[in-house]
């Protein structure tokens, strides 16, 4: 079961971290700490160096007890500018906004938070699940600069959910310039 209060706190924490493109190290460290808490093996690639950034793409793997192919969950760690000095504000009605001086960073830290909470909830439930691959990429905003350097053949998943889309809940994109084929 998803814990909405915990998800809100997680998003607020992530949205408080500076995360302009190619400067995602602090967000990456936060995610790595979350993955460590969950006992999820992770690795960071060398993309940061290739794109003159301070962090690489993060890959995580959570084994599953079900004999099913893994599924990939993905979101990017950067936000459009201005993404430095962010102050997310939780309003009494439950909405979250920026303070108006920067972006909120919901694109795509909301996706990062949703993935981390979903994985935590699955683990806490004790329910058998299929293996889960996680991919958190850097420098998505400047034309997917970071994900272009990821080692896609290393992925086992044939199905993926990339949590980076605006629109009504339940909307899905089936084609885009950077959709994994």
Task: Describe these PLM feature segments.
Residues 1-22:
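N-terminal capping segment at the start of a domain
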Residues 3, 147-181:
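Metal-dependent peptidase/peptidase-like ectodomains
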Residues 18, 22-25, 33-38:
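Short glycine- and acidic-rich boundary segments immediately preceding or forming the N-terminal edge
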Residues 28, 34, 53-54, 61-63, ...:
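Active-site metal-coordination/substrate-binding segment of hydrolases
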Residues 41:
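Residue-level detector of anion-binding/catalytic polar loops
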Residues 55-58, 181:
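Short glycine-rich loop/turn motifs
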């Amino acid at each position: 079961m998803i814990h909405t209060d915990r998800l809100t706190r997680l998003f607020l924490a992530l949205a408080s971290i500076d995360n302009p493109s190619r400067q995602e190290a602090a967000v990456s460290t936060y995610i790595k700490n979350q993955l460590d808490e969950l006992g999820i093996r992770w690795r960071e690639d060398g993309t940061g160096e290739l794109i003159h950034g301070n962090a690489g793409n993060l890959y995580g793997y959570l084994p599953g007890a079900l004999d099913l192919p893994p599924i990939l969950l993905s979101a990017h760690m950067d936000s459009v500018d201005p993404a430095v000095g962010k102050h997310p504000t939780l309003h009494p009605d439950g909405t979250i906004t920026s303070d108006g001086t920067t972006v909120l960073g919901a694109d795509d830290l909301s996706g990062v938070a949703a993935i981390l909470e979903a994985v935590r909830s699955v683990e806490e439930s004790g329910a058998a699940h299929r293996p889960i691959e996680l991919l958190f990429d850097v420098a998505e905003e400047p034309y997917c600069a970071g994900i272009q350097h990821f080692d896609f053949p290393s992925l086992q998943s044939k199905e993926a959910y990339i949590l980076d889309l605006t629109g009504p809940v339940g909307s899905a994109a089936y084609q885009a310039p950077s959709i994994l084929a």
